[in-house]
Amino acid sequence: DFTNGKLYQTTTLPKGSYKLTVNFKEYGVKAGSSLYFAVAAGNEVPDVDDVESNSIAYHDFGTGENKTPSECVIEFEIKEDTQEVALGFVASFSANSWFRATGLKLELK
């Protein structure tokens, strides 16, 4: 088990509308576990309990399994001339939860 495991990267983005696509090979989120992909202002993604209130945008994977390739798309807007953001995963997993991401693509729309 672990709480608030994070895998993220920071970057500075110019003003604009963005589309972020996250590709997965598979994932399994067991009951009592949480998995998010978050875009947050600043230099770190928030903890699991704060993702929904402290993110510019996020995707909640809920609970369940998906053993086929899939993707999630997150759209968001940067309103400042430039803004530092953190993009990445945050999870609290009980035993036997997992995910395998295969790619991330950030596009300025």
Predicted stretch roles:
Residues T3-N4, N66-T68, V90-K109:
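Extracellular carbohydrate recognition
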Residues G5-L35, C72-F76, L104:
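Extra-cytoplasmic beta-strand recognition segments
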Residues T11, T21-G62:
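Extracellular ligand-binding interfaces
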Residues L13, F24-E26, A41, I78, ...:
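Short beta-strand segments enriched in hydrophobic/aromatic residues
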Residues Y18, Q83-L87:
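Exposed beta-strand face motif in extracellular beta-rich ectodomains
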Residues V29-S33, D81-Q83, A95-R100:
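Short loop/turn segments at connectors of secondary-structure elements within structured domains
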Residues V45-T82, S94:
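Extracellular carbohydrate recognition and processing domains
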